[in-house]
Amino acid sequence: MESKKKRLMDYIFGAHNYEANFNPKRQAKIKDLGHGKAKVLVWELPVRIWHWVNFLAIIVLMFTGLYIALAFTSARFETHATSFLMGWMRWIHFVTAFVFMAALLFRIYWTFVGNRYTTFDIYKPGFIRGLWESVKFYIFLPNKKPHTIGHNALAQFAYWIFFGICSIILSITGLYLFFEPQQGSFMMSILGWVPIIFGNSVKLHIWHQGAAWGTMIFMVAHIYLAFREDYLVTNGTMSSIFSGWKFDKKKYVVGEENE
């Protein structure tokens, strides 16, 4: 009983320690810049490629998804090239959706094989305290935000809720809606449990669109907070999504960020 209570208290109030990966041997590359400064390869090449593939996929899915739902325009002149506009939008949406799902599966895989900054360990000690202090930091309140080189607690929480969960809901409901006309097919036999959880076709559309809007909100907030972090902390947050490198004091980069 005492150990359970202690673990709970450590999780809420303990020292910040949620940047450790499932594989502690995979430490990030570090380069000494002198004068007490260093840079660390936070985002490895596979993560950066995934980031940009994912970004482009979401943009395409947002546009085509809105068109499928609202059909906000149509061809002014019916020609061979324009008369199938909705069909083209649906085709692009479906192809991009499979790219999005493949990227999601790869990112889950890389969580286990990448460096220490590729994971989102919201169960680590001190996570709740770090989350609250990060919220205060972003809304300009006095705070004791723990020093982090990778994702801070708020970013990790947002990834879990608005990206991780929403992506899974989008993938499951999207797959079912795609294969729904093919009753009796192999894929429908695999996905038969989906309406039991999410409801009929109408409710599935609502779940799908709700998760899509959640992803859009996350994306806007993510871009704003990344620019804000880069401006306030000046650690190369924005340039790191191209180069992978972030800059900090050497004592933090070599593994003392939890102190």
Named regions from a protein language model:
Residues 1-259:
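Membrane-embedded alpha-helical bundles that constitute the cytochrome b-like, heme-associated redox core
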